[in-house]
Amino acid sequence: MGSLLGLCLIVQIITGLFLAMHYVSDISSAFSSVAHICRDVNYGWLIRNFHANGASLFFICIYLHIARGLYYGSYLYMETWNIGVILLLLTMMTAFVGYV
């Protein structure tokens, strides 16, 4: 699970950087810049889909990682488990801020 999480995170960072190169955050042209990415940028639609679906896959891998920890009783290691919970909360907050 950890290697899949790392791969998903790397894909998210790379696709996010490529999308940020063409995105305009001005309120009057934000939608037009997304349409520009999908229509005019080479494989822009694919990069956008990888970025959107990669986020879902990232969280599925996180939940599977947590489920494995619950199954094997890793919650008994309190320090490690608490750090994992903090990382999960930080990841969820970052995803929310990135979505908004």
From Swiss-Prot:
Annotated GO biological process: mitochondrial electron transport, ubiquinol to cytochrome c
Gene3D superfamilies from the UniProt entry: Cytochrome Bc1 Complex, Chain C (1.20.810.10)
One GO CC term on file: mitochondrial inner membrane
GO molecular function: metal ion binding; ubiquinol-cytochrome-c reductase activity
Keywords from the named record: Electron transport, Heme, Iron, Membrane, Metal-binding, Mitochondrion, Mitochondrion inner membrane, Respiratory chain, Transmembrane, Transmembrane helix, Transport, Ubiquinone
Keyword hit for Magnesium: no
DNA-binding listed as a keyword: no
Binding residues annotated for heme b b562, in chain numbering: 51
Cofactor dependence: heme b
Cofactor, how bound (note): Binds 2 heme b groups non-covalently.
Sequence positions that bind heme b b566: 65
Membrane topology: Multi-pass membrane protein
Membrane-spanning residues: 1-21, 45-66, 81-100
Subcellular location, record wording: Mitochondrion inner membrane
Note: Heme 1 (or BL or b562) is low-potential and absorbs at about 562 nm, and heme 2 (or BH or b566) is high-potential and absorbs at about 566 nm.
Function: Component of the ubiquinol-cytochrome c reductase complex (complex III or cytochrome b-c1 complex) that is part of the mitochondrial respiratory chain. The b-c1 complex mediates electron transfer from ubiquinol to cytochrome c. Contributes to the generation of a proton gradient across the mitochondrial membrane that is then used for ATP synthesis.
Protein family membership: Belongs to the cytochrome b family.
Oligomer and partners: The cytochrome bc1 complex contains 3 respiratory subunits (MT-CYB, CYC1 and UQCRFS1), 2 core proteins (UQCRC1 and UQCRC2) and probably 6 low-molecular weight proteins.
Protein name, UniProt field: Cytochrome b
Source species: Polypterus sp.
Gene, per the UniProt record: mt-cyb
